[in-house]
Amino acid sequence: MSFHAIVIGTGVDALVAAHLLARRGKQVLLVEERSPAIRDFGWVPSQIVAELGLALEVEAPDPWAVALLPDGAKLELWRDIGRSSQSIRHYSERDAQKWPGFCRRMAALARLFEQLYLEAPTDPLNLRFALGVRGLGREGMVDLMRLLPMPVTELLDDWFECDALKGALAAMGILNIQQGPRSGGTAFRFLHHHVGSPEGVFRPPRTELSTRLRQLARLGLYFKAAETKKILTKAGRARGVLLGDGEEIEAPIVVSGADPRRTLLELADPGWLDPELARAVGNIRARGVAARLLFEGPANGNLVFAPSLDYLERAYDEIKYGRVSREPYLEAHSSPRGLEVHFQYVPQGAKEDFGDLAATARRLLPGLENAKLVSILGPADLERDEGWPQGQPYHAELALDQALWMRPLPELSQYKTPIEGLWLCGPAMHPGGGVAGAAGYNCSQAILKEKI
């Protein structure tokens, strides 16, 4: 059987790209070595859901965060802005009054990025981008220009005084990156994780989009559970894949959901790349910084242990020296499997007994004292089980120099590689992790414009 395209699948973006190409009448083979178990994290744009022809359930937890404090107190943040203000008022009357204005201004900035995230990355001098910024008005333009490079600590200190509120919000600026809240660019990452969420909600949803797409039969789409050993090339052009069992399958288009380093330096022949580009690909930063713990037991809501900005900065200090944080940032979410706990920071190759992580989680999160631990996955385990390079779920760190029109490199930002017919669609591509399926959507649209 002949195929128009082969998609190398390692996650939601590869699934979205494969389904959308098949929906446009292409014969597509999706080669997937593993079926990741972790739920998809991030905004799923309604445009993608509509084009896939899905009815997708998106969780809407309320409160969306319960910020825990060391003394046992808690700050509940609700989807209703007024109700959150009432909660904040117990800690600061001033912050309660400022909360609605903060939510309004962050939502205005996030809406600009919603437009940018569903298309190939735009050059900052592009007229449409400039008009979008102009549409923010003077106040919004100042907010955007100040926010992009600044540490999230400065953004939040400008608005609030309550440590618990600032810590819970700042956590989205350091999620899955080896930086602390005082690092430059963390305010941009805070905003990135707000894109697509309702005004006043600063946690992206979780969905079962990948699971639904694996279950969805589509004319022209074929699945094969196999390891991709090589991307075959001839005269500088992709011509198919070599599987782990030695089978060769040909197609004029190969779309890789694997990270750029693995795709271009291991699966494909790097000899087809300019040496400077090959060096730059090898230097893309993709460091995992977290472990995932799963506990059995009853649901405990959406818990955050990030009691202050200073606490988060101290947690980050440990990983700089290759150590697991003894006082970590924790984020816990109920799921059909139990309570999933994000434990940050855990460096790649950490030597500590992972049993200590469970003890720390039990100490800091209520209700886990007698809960059975099901599993602990460190960065190396997440690379093996989920296909995340070095345990980095975004395949390339979402730092400001690896974002937007520079994601993951300016030379690769349009999803096309220098090897003719080879495309990149994984979360290392614009807009990055935290927007489920958008990179796969954008890549598929770029391929279809080539009229394959």
Where do the language-model regions lie?
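A glycine-rich dinucleotide-binding beta-alpha-beta segment and adjacent secondary-structure elements
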Residues: 162, 166-179, 327-329, 366-430
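Active-site/ligand-binding neighborhood in enzyme catalytic cores
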Residues: 107-220, 225-226, 388-397, 401-402
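C-terminal segments that line or cap access tunnels to active or ligand-binding sites in enzymes
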Residues: 298-386
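Hydrophobic residues within alpha-helices
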Residues: 17, 209-212, 443
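A conserved FAD-binding loop/helix module that cradles the flavin
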Residues: 427-448
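Hydrophobic, well-ordered secondary-structure elements that form the walls
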Residues: 255, 295, 341, 360-361, ...
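Mid-domain catalytic core of redox enzymes
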Residues: 199-206, 227-337
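N-terminal glycine-rich phosphate/pyrophosphate-binding loop and immediately adjacent elements
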Residues: 2-118
